[in-house]
Regions:
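Short, glycine-/small-residue-rich phosphate/pyrophosphate-handling segment
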Residues: 94, 108-157
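N-terminal beta1-alpha1-beta2 submodule of the flavodoxin-like/Rossmannoid cofactor-binding fold
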Residues: 1-109, 154-193
Length: 193
C-alpha cells in the first residue's frame, strides 16, 4: 500500500507540511509506504513552472525527465493521495495549483480514477479560508475522478471535509489529532475499497 502526500506550502518550516507528516505517520504505523512531495522542490527544475496548454491532448513534454514526471508516476502507482495547502486568498497555493494544472496527461489516462483522496488546509487565523481551500482541494481531486474522504472516524467523530487548522499547529493538539484522524481514515478507506 502506498500513500502520497503533496505539500503545497513554499515555506521551509511549514504548518501544512507538519500536519501532512502527522497524517502520513498514521498511515505508516500500519505498514503503508508513504512519501511527501514538496511542490516547490517538484517545480524547481521546470523551465516554465505552470501549464501553458501547449498541446491538446497533453503530451507531457514540458515535464519529461523532470521531477514532476517522477512524481506523477508515483501518484499513478499510489493507492491514495493527500493534498495539503496553506490558504492563499481563500484557495490553494500557486505552487500546488501549478502542479495540478500540469496533471492533464494523468487525467487523460484516467490514472487516478477511484483512488482515495483527502485534504489538509492551514490558514493564518481561525476563519482564514481553510474550508474554501479544502473545497478547492476536493475539486482538484474530483476532476481526477478520485474518491474523497474527510477526517471522520467510526466510533469517534463523523468529522468534516478535512483538516482545517490555523497557525501555529506544532503544539495545537486539535489540529494534530485531526491530521492523525484523516491519515487513519485514508488508510481505512484504502483497505476497504
Amino acid at each position: 500500500m502506498k500513500i502520497i502526500g503533496i505539500n503545497g506550502s513554499p515555506r521551509k518550516k511549514s504548518n501544512t507540511r507538519f500536519l501532512l507528516e502527522k497524517a502520513l505517520g498514521e498511515c505508516g504505523k500500519s505498514g503503508a509506504k508513504t512519501k511527501i512531495y514538496d511542490a516547490m522542490k517538484v517545480l524547481d527544475d521546470q523551465e516554465v513552472p505552470f501549464c501553458e496548454h501547449c498541446s491538446s491532448p497533453c503530451n507531457s513534454s514540458c515535464y519529461e525527465g523532470k521531477k514532476l514526471e517522477k512524481m506523477f508516476e508515483e501518484l499513478k502507482q499510489s493507492d491514495a493521495i493527500i493534498l495539503a495547502s496553506p490558504v492563499y486568498f481563500g484557495t490553494v497555493s500557486a505552487q500546488l495549483k501549478a502542479i495540478w494544472d500540469m496533471s492533464r496527461a494523468v487525467r487523460t489516462e484516467h490514472a487516478l480514477v477511484g483512488k482515495i483522496g483527502a485534504a489538509i488546509s492551514v490558514g493564518a487565523s481561525t476563519y482564514g479560508g481553510q474550508e474554501t481551500t479544502i473545497r478547492a482541494l476536493h475539486d482538484m481531486l474530483l476532476v481526477q475522478g478520485m474518491t474523497i474522504v474527510g477526517n471522520g472516524l467510526k466510533g469517534i467523530d463523523v468529522g468534516h471535509h478535512g483538516v482545517a487548522a490555523r497557525e501555529e499547529v506544532f503544539e495545537y493538539e486539535p489540529a494534530i489529532e485531526d491530521a492523525k484522524n484523516i491519515g487513519k481514515r485514508v488508510l481505512d478507506s484504502v483497505c476497504h475499497s
